Amino acid sequence: MNDLELLWLKEFKEVTASDEKNFKPYMEYSEFADCTFYGLYAWQRNFQYAYKMYGDVLVVLEIKKDISVILFYKNGSDIFGVMQQLYELFKEADLSLTFRYVAKSQLDFYKNSAEAIGKTISYSASADDSDYIYEVGDFLCLDGKKNKGKRIGLNSLYRMYPEISIKKYEYNKNNGKNGIIEDCYHIFDQWCESHTCENCVYGCEKEVFRRFIEVFDIARHEICVSYAGEKPLSFAVNERINEDTTCCIFQKNASRIRGLTYWLNREMLLQDNDVRYLNLGEDMGINGIRIDKNSFHPCYKKEKYVVKVQ
């Protein structure tokens, strides 16, 4: 990063725990859990997120390998002027203006905004980064030939752990570092024993989880752990990202127990009866994860577009 870029970036502020209030007005417009306030704060040290307000538009920089932009805006926001300012800033720093986490439904908006300042856009999306979306009724359904795999997995799980149970994290300000949260860390430790840090290409997920707990919001988040007796087996964390969608943002089945991942997702949905869609996130191009997520029959995959302004 050159001196000009460093000078420019001083205008932007690191995302901290106290910034939640600045992001809240945009929560109902969230398309992806990757870029809610909680996700940005949790992954802050890995992606060096920084933000700045441009009128009623919140601009977040993601600084991993290249600098890119995530836009937060409301219905009716006029981003023409914002795009013009960003384009000039990036041009001055000899950088290409690139937006990430753009939904397909937003492409025309970005196209029209770019044209309003005399520019064009190009865009692309990777299957590796696309989120798997499930209609909750279909995800819970065990009937029919297509759901045979779900039934086989659950039957295998019940034979191995007939007394399997689930516990939900009941948050208060005094128990953030004990109770089932410690069991989540234990499951992480088990998972780490069979993986190397070099394979965690986005950084240490356990440390990301620690930061997430700092901003846990009981109104938006649910943490559940599965147990065989007193032994923790797996855990999952869901985040409500809009009025009808919950997204699984952390999930670990350290012992790779057959049927357990689906069972825990299913039990959490059965306790949350006003959700229409479940987002299980991306597969990162890992074939085993792709096979598992397809086996639950997604209703569609939600692409995350990268938009470049030229």
Give the ranges of each region predicted by the language model.
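Amide-forming acyltransferase catalytic core, primarily the GNAT-like/NAT-type
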Residues: 2-56, 200-201
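Conserved donor-binding loop and adjoining core beta-sheet/short helix segment
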Residues: 35-106, 227-255
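Short, glycine/charge-rich beta-strand/loop segments that flank catalytic centers
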Residues: 96-113, 127-132
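Short catalytic-loop micro-motif centered on adjacent basic/acidic residues
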Residues: 98-100, 167, 277-280
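Conserved active-site alpha-helix within GNAT-family acetyltransferase domains
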Residues: 106-123, 152, 284-301
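Acyltransferase donor/substrate-recognition loop-hinge adjacent to the catalytic core
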Residues: 116-197
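Short, conserved active-site entrance elements at the starts or edges of catalytic domains
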Residues: 171-231
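Aromatic (often tryptophan-rich) hydrophobic motifs at membrane interfaces
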Residues: 220-310
